[in-house]
Amino acid sequence: MSVDLATVKRVARLARIAVSEDEANRMVGELNGILGFVEQLSEVNVDGVEAMTSVTPTAMKKRTDEVTDGSKAADIVANAPVTDHNFFLVPKVVE
């Protein structure tokens, strides 16, 4: 795949970026260079290579799944104008 001047201008217009003619011509070469590097990466054989999520091998620590109220209900409703038993009270809007 290659990028031409019309594509650069179209993308710049869609991104609402002001690009001069000289800048657009320079970007054509830069974008084609980037796409060349991406094409090289797609040629690498990665069969049997496990996907990496980190540079160092790590295992996520698991915690027990416990349901709690968070012990913060009073703090959460502290600034509410009207509450009842740690619930927000709001005016009725639907009859």
Curated annotation (Swiss-Prot):
- Catalysed conversion reaction: L-glutamyl-tRNA(Gln) + L-glutamine + ATP + H2O = L-glutaminyl-tRNA(Gln) + L-glutamate + ADP + phosphate + H(+); L-aspartyl-tRNA(Asn) + L-glutamine + ATP + H2O = L-asparaginyl-tRNA(Asn) + L-glutamate + ADP + phosphate + 2 H(+)
Gene3D superfamilies registered for this protein in UniProt? Glu-tRNAGln amidotransferase C subunit, N-terminal domain (1.10.20.60)
The family database entries (SUPFAM superfamilies) matched by this protein are listed as: Glu-tRNAGln amidotransferase C subunit (SSF141000)
Q: State its Enzyme Commission number(s).
A: 6.3.5.-
Q: Name one GO molecular function term.
A: ATP binding
Question: A Pfam family in this protein?
Answer: GatC
UniProt keyword list: ATP-binding, Ligase, Nucleotide-binding, Protein biosynthesis
Q: Which domain of life is it from?
A: Bacteria
Q: What class of enzyme is it?
A: ligase
Signal peptide (UniProt feature, chain positions): none
Q: Does the keyword Ligase apply?
A: yes
Q: Which InterPro entries does this UniProt record tie to the protein?
A: Asp/Glu-ADT_sf_sub_c (IPR036113), GatC (IPR003837)
Asked if the Swiss-Prot or TrEMBL record annotates the protein with the keyword Cell membrane, the reply is: no
GO BP, sorted A to Z: glutaminyl-tRNAGln biosynthesis via transamidation; regulation of translational fidelity; translation
Checking NCBIfam families in the record gives: gatC (TIGR00135)
State its role: Allows the formation of correctly charged Asn-tRNA(Asn) or Gln-tRNA(Gln) through the transamidation of misacylated Asp-tRNA(Asn) or Glu-tRNA(Gln) in organisms which lack either or both of asparaginyl-tRNA or glutaminyl-tRNA synthetases. The reaction takes place in the presence of glutamine and ATP through an activated phospho-Asp-tRNA(Asn) or phospho-Glu-tRNA(Gln).
Q: Which family does it belong to?
A: Belongs to the GatC family.
Can you state the subunit structure given in the record? Heterotrimer of A, B and C subunits.
Q: What is this protein called?
A: Aspartyl/glutamyl-tRNA(Asn/Gln) amidotransferase subunit C
Task: Please tell me the species this chain comes from.
Answer: Rhizobium johnstonii (strain DSM 114642 / LMG 32736 / 3841)
